[in-house]
């Protein structure tokens, strides 16, 4: 039996939303194994002096929980 867990994260990038999403997944993958998908819940932009300076996303990342024997699934 497979069990999937979700982790909510926020990430931002001056390059754009796609880069912010990639940064969220990259950061999560540094401590999680078995990442299955990323769901972008919200998009937000930081504005300073009438210009967009940061692109921010709130995401839910799904990953498989390992079984007690140490493997996935």
What are these regions (language model features)?
Residues 2-36:
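Short, well-ordered alpha-helical segments
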Residues 4, 35-38, 52-58:
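Short connector loops at helix/strand junctions that flank enzyme active sites
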Residues 38-47:
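Short, conserved loop-to-beta-strand elements that form functional interface hotspots
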Residues 50-73:
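C-terminal structural segments of small proteins and small subunits
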């Amino acid at each position: 039996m497979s069990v999937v867990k979700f982790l909510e994260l926020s990430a931002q990038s001056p390059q754009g939303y796609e880069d912010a999403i990639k940064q969220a997944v990259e950061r999560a993958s540094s401590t999680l194994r078995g990442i299955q998908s990323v769901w972008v819940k919200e998009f937000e932009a930081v504005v300073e002096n009438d210009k967009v300076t940061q692109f921010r996303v709130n995401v839910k990342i799904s990953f498989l929980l390992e079984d007690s024997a140490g493997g996935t699934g």
